[in-house]
Curated annotation (Swiss-Prot):
Ranges where the record places region Acidic: 88-96
Subcellular location: Host cell membrane
GO cellular component, one term: host cell plasma membrane
Species this protein is from: Simian immunodeficiency virus (isolate Mm142-83) (SIV-mac)
Protein name: Protein Nef
Domain of life: Viruses
Length: 262
């Protein structure tokens, strides 16, 4: 299912995995006891160019649900100046920007079920996200990569939470799993305060350290919807009162209120 799209491509993708790993740290394979070593090495000869761009954390907005259909490419083009400003927010010593297109190579489009599956398999075949720590910075890198290379509007990375995070975009096969940082890693001055294993706790509203994991069953099991229908609002079939009750029970309403007043 995922191999067809990769065979159609005339050139390899930009080096997504390597740029993600350069975003202050490697994957959890080198910091956790009992985890197979060497998983931080890329498996494919990916193209060069994607930079370690600074990221902004995703803000939880009640009513912002899967694939946000009210957004369209024409409106997104109007936001290009703002996005260019975000792209400029990089480390001064980063020299990997040469060759990165400021605008998308292809027409803008929203993420779809089929596209999410194809991109998930394609990324996996070219090295993947497996074992890489999640952070707001890496979230933004992935957004920019798929926007510039595939024209995918960056509104699709909205996860459930806390615990195992499932993307609310049905078809994306990478989930985020909470991981426990070893005492050795916590006390390692080389990684402390700069490694994503430390900083990702600041990016996450629940203070969890997260890492990507491939799960092919997400192609036919809509886990985010099954487990957390209240996060889909009226699309869930639940009453407004029940939606608010469930969101409040999980602390999401209070969290949204704090962000609005901050």
């Amino acid at each position: 299912m995922g191999g067809a799209i990769s065979k159609k491509r005339s050139k390899p993708p930009r080096d997504l995995r390597q740029r993600l790993l350069r975003a202050r740290g490697e994957n959890y394979g080198r910091l956790f006891k009992g985890v197979e070593d060497g998983s931080s090495q890329s498996l494919g000869g990916l193209d060069k160019g994607l930079s370690s761009l600074s990221c902004e954390g995703q803000k939880y907005n009640q009513g912002e649900y899967m694939n946000t259909p009210w957004r369209n490419p024409a409106e997104e083009r109007k936001k290009l100046p703002y996005r260019k400003q975000n792209i400029d927010d990089i480390d001064e010593e980063d020299d990997d920007l040469v060759g990165i297109p400021v605008e998308a190579r292809v027409p803008l489009r929203t993420m779809s079920y089929k596209l999410a599956i194809d991109m998930s398999h394609f990324i996996k075949e070219k090295g993947g996200l497996e074992g890489i720590y999640y952070s707001a910075r890496r979230h933004r890198i992935l957004d920019i990569y798929l926007e510039k290379e595939e024209g995918i509007i960056p509104d699709w990375q909205i996860h459930s939470g806390p615990g195992i995070r499932y993307l609310k975009m049905f078809g994306w096969l990478w989930k985020l799993i909470p991981v426990n940082v070893s005492d050795e890693a916590q006390e390692d001055e080389e990684h402390y305060l700069v490694h994503p294993a430390q900083t990702s706790q600041w990016d996450d509203p629940w203070g969890e350290v997260l890492a990507w994991k491939f799960d092919p069953t997400l192609a036919y099991t809509y886990e985010a919807y099954i487990r957390y229908p209240e996060e889909f609002g009226s699309k869930s079939g639940l009453s407004e009162k029940e939606v608010k009750r469930r969101l409040a029970a999980r602390g999401l309403l209070e969290m949204a209120d704090r962000k609005e007043t901050s």
